[in-house]
Amino acid sequence: MLKGRNLLDPMDFSLEELEGVFKLADEIIESPEKFLHVCDGKILATLFYEPSTRTRFSFEAAMLRLGGQVIGFSEPNSSSVAKGESVADTIRTVGCYADIAAMRHPKEGAPAIAAMYSEIPVINAGDGSHQHPTQTLTDLLTIRSLKGDLSNLTIGCCGDLKFGRTVHSLVKALSRYKNNKFVFMSPEELKIPDYIRKEILEKNNIEYKEVSKMEDAMAELDILYMTRVQRERFFNEDDYVRLKDSYILDGEKMKYAKKDMMVLHPLPRVNEIAYEIDQDPRGCYFKQAKYGMYVRMALIAKLLGVR
């Protein structure tokens, strides 16, 4: 049972619990009309201390499609945070009004602090460059639905691997499934963090390699996970400008890829995926966005104990 639990890290749920979420998402996709009222009378609080379009809209759409309601803020200046209120006090107050909360915060660990003081389930909707577990659930459901399995895959991660919280969460999650291998493609300044390399991959004897050119790895990939270079993570604008166009996926590079490779992206994109790829059936990132709403519907229903 996931009722009353928090989701702060993709490792919080066992593989069996994750599969339960995915199976419920499958049911929702198959028969959404059966779930129109399962959250009647329930309220989701969206506490977004950082800008977001897709994640926030996805959570809100998920709750509304379950029959629930949504309260919250989309940037801290519109809340008591601007007056200096702590995360602990905010979540305790919000818990008086809502049944479940989704929090995005620029500081790593902020949702975990909120969960310590909260009497309602807290979902980490992204904390700094640390974790983004509901994006990971989205990614896993997309791969599972389109590939049929989450094992025996070669996954390429490309772009900003240092600050990209979606990559960190995805590598941790897919490392739990059998016989997965990773290929990391990034500029030297944006390489995968040591803690992922040492504590997740090497500690568990998971095969990985790092390459400097996308073309060197494309032919072996089952999944290509693209990310943007995030301007908001840079203190120096010159560094951002120098690195932002480091890796761009276009039709020429796709010629090296398998016919059934999947291209995923957590969105928003800037220019790291050429628009011509949108017409390629291997470009699955907009399907991925839709799966995100369904998996959040399933997660909310599970944490509230209504399914």
From Swiss-Prot:
Any one GO MF annotation of this record: aspartate carbamoyltransferase activity
This enzyme's EC code(s): 2.1.3.2
Reactions the enzyme catalyzes: carbamoyl phosphate + L-aspartate = N-carbamoyl-L-aspartate + phosphate + H(+)
Residues given in the record as L-aspartate binding sites: 83, 165, 228
InterPro entries to which the protein is assigned, alphabetical: Asp/Orn_carbamoyltranf_P-bd, Asp/Orn_carbamoylTrfase, Asp/Orn_carbamoylTrfase_sf, Asp_carbamoyltransf, Asp_carbamoyltransf_Asp/Orn-bd
Keywords in alphabetical order: Pyrimidine biosynthesis, Transferase
Transferase among keywords: yes
Lineage: superkingdom: Bacteria
A GO biological-process term: 'de novo' pyrimidine nucleobase biosynthetic process
UniProt enzyme class: transferase
Pathway it works in: Pyrimidine metabolism; UMP biosynthesis via de novo pathway; (S)-dihydroorotate from bicarbonate: step 2/3
Entry coiled-coil feature ranges: none
Residues involved in carbamoyl phosphate binding: 54-55, 104, 132, 135, 267-268
Subunit relationships: Heterododecamer (2C3:3R2) of six catalytic PyrB chains organized as two trimers (C3), and six regulatory PyrI chains organized as three dimers (R2).
HAMAP family, A to Z: Asp_carb_tr
UniProt family annotation: Belongs to the aspartate/ornithine carbamoyltransferase superfamily. ATCase family.
NCBIfam families the UniProt entry points to: asp_carb_tr (TIGR00670), PRK00856.1 (NF002032)
Identification of the protein by name: Aspartate carbamoyltransferase catalytic subunit
Organism: Clostridium botulinum (strain Loch Maree / Type A3)
